[in-house]
């Protein structure tokens, strides 16, 4: 289970040093094998391989005749990269994925249960500002009656 927010720096070889709290879960859940892919929100998604496999199976079963599902499948499956975390807990992010998410030196990691989102720092701050600007009336119906 991934939760919490952390800001980390890419090293000179564009490797992401995975924080210990996420690293331990990746080692337990996937033996350090991860899948990193693009997200429509212009961030990256990092999954332990066993978490990604059923998602990929569902995505590839979707029809290519619906342009919207085909586009989503092209994005999520097309950008997916299998990556092995090294012994120091680093993940080498492919140039195509770094470019897609506009990742530079500082990367924000956001735990989201079964996955971790990787954000450009400025884009993450804008995302948080947008989330804070929602009014109660604008909440989706799924959240009605939800309390913290």
From Swiss-Prot:
It holds the Pfam family MraZ. One of its GO terms (molecular function) is transcription cis-regulatory region binding. This is Transcriptional regulator MraZ. GO terms for cellular component: cytoplasm; nucleoid. Keywords: Cytoplasm, DNA-binding, Repeat, Transcription, Transcription regulation. PROSITE patterns: SPOVT_ABRB (PS51740). The gene is mraZ. Forms oligomers. Belongs to the MraZ family. The keyword Cytoplasm applies. It is found in: Cytoplasm, Nucleoid. Residues 5-51, 80-123 form the SpoVT-AbrB domain. It comes from Thiobacillus denitrificans (strain ATCC 25259 / T1). One of its GO terms (biological process) is negative regulation of DNA-templated transcription initiation.
